[in-house]
Amino acid sequence: MADFFLMDSFDLAGRTIYLRVDINSPVNPVTGEIMGTDRFRAHVETIRKLRDSKVVIVAHQSRPGKDDFTSLRQHAQVMSRILNKKVMFVDQLFGSLVNKTVESMNEGDIVMLENARFYSEEVDLTTLESMENSNIVKGLSTLFDYYIIDAFAAIHRAQTTLVGFRRIKPNIAGALIEKEVTMIDRFRHLNESPKIAILGGAKIDDSIAVSENFLKSGFVDKILTGGVVANAFLWAKGIDIGKKNRDFIIKNNGDYEKLIAKCKGLLSEFGDRILVPSDFILSPSGERVSANGKIPDDQILADIGLDTVVEYSEIIDKAKAIFMNGPMGIYEIEAYSSGTREIFSSVAKSEAFSIAGGGHTLSALDKLGLTNRIDHASTGGGALISYLSGEAMPVLEALKESKRLFEV
């Protein structure tokens, strides 16, 4: 972490702090209420370290066009409850009301500004120069002394409130980013083998991309698949996964033929290192079937079967490092939760260094009471995968550049 300024690099007491967090959360489509608080709680340590500062929180929720693209007013209320401290909300990101509010703040006060993505400058600007000349940066930069970035789940984004201030004010890594980078770098640089990845859930494109990177780079020795990810690889192997399962992949993936072709290519090159389930539990019948037979068109592959659990658990038991992203099936329904429960429990019992990421993965771990038995439960989904895949991380690059510019 020597490349970044950390929170103990400066005396922040009495200072006005711009704190960029990621509290983007699922919203109940019926009631409009925030459904999870994990991302709020992840930032508590950083905020408490700023108890003697004036803290201005900047964040986003969803993106334009989505049903959950909402104001952050409710987010401020949720944060207030978690901190047991008033978090004032201002329905602007910049402007006269923000200026007046920040100028009247006392030490210990916390203010949350409006959803950054309500403003086109947040997502439309692509160059640092255009960001620095934006109303967002010009409107906010005169109000604060230091910029703290704690939004690990957004480190793969190059957006104005995330990277646009790096040459304007010292950019500092918050406690969450410090912890995330430390733990993930430990995993990345672990030289012990075997290393395995467990990839499940429904996000096929992400899992295929990470599979390709992990296998071609030699980062992992084996990949164990489950969920819709496994279904895609089975389809690529020429196995009849049934109409309902094919239709789900087609409906939820734009260029599904390209994805299946990519799966075929990976199987051709790394076939013995990509494991697919040998048996399944069907829904709604509840029948256990072999993966080699034809799956009835009216049935869903809802969970992995016992033979797969035994095979995967033996591999997990011998692993030295494990990355897991995505459940093995429809874990939310008790009848189809066994595969996820058994595989995640095997990881928890393992002596391997383990990292988990992705919203459904963390939700399943929490439901099973296993979160504290995983070495690191990351707040990042796409960000975690991108970082592990060796892609450029704009926020981390901004932190490095800012330290070079402002280091005395």
Curated annotation (Swiss-Prot):
Pfam short name (any one): PGK
Pathway annotation: Carbohydrate degradation; glycolysis; pyruvate from D-glyceraldehyde 3-phosphate: step 2/5
Binding, ATP: E332, G358, G359, H360, T361
Top enzyme category: transferase
Catalyzed reactions: (2R)-3-phosphoglycerate + ATP = (2R)-3-phospho-glyceroyl phosphate + ADP
Entry keywords, A to Z: ATP-binding, Cytoplasm, Glycolysis, Kinase, Nucleotide-binding, Transferase
Coiled coil: none
Keyword NADP: no
Annotated residues for binding of substrate: D22, I23, N24, R39, H60, Q61, S62, R63, R117, R157
Record-level GO cellular component terms: cytosol
Record-level Gene Ontology MF annotations: ADP binding; ATP binding; phosphoglycerate kinase activity
EC number(s) per entry: 2.7.2.3
GO biological process: gluconeogenesis; glycolytic process
Family according to the record: Belongs to the phosphoglycerate kinase family.
Subunit structure of this chain's protein: Monomer.
Protein name in UniProt: Phosphoglycerate kinase
Organism: Thermoplasma volcanium (strain ATCC 51530 / DSM 4299 / JCM 9571 / NBRC 15438 / GSS1)
Taxonomic lineage: Archaea, Methanobacteriati, Thermoplasmatota, Thermoplasmata, Thermoplasmatales
Gene behind this protein: pgk
